[in-house]
Amino acid sequence: MVIGIGVDVVEIERFRRSLERTPSMRDRLFTVGELAALADRVDPVPGLAARFAAREATMKSLGLGLGAFGFHDVWVRRLEGGAPELVVEGRALELATAAGVGRWHLSLSHVDSVAVAYVVAE
């Protein structure tokens, strides 16, 4: 049963400027694994923007706002075939469990100007 749906869109260039202005944001927002997974890309910012959107979409799927859980409580890893997988831990997992969520679906995409994440909580 679907418990919630969340979608978030991030303007890539605006996100890039934020990262340039505040370099410490990368470590605050993303796990070491996420940063390492994108380190070999010519431009990792679109992928980072999509992963940030995944966090926001997850909050929305639970009916929560920014600050409900830490940014490292939700992160994205790639499965062997390349599909993104949402990992939910810590406070986010507690809130999701209380809401009855036992399964997540995640879709990420980005084009020149925007990154989008779509999350379904079941």
Per-region residue spans from a language model:
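Core catalytic alpha/beta fold that binds nucleotide/phospho-ligands
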Residues: 1-122
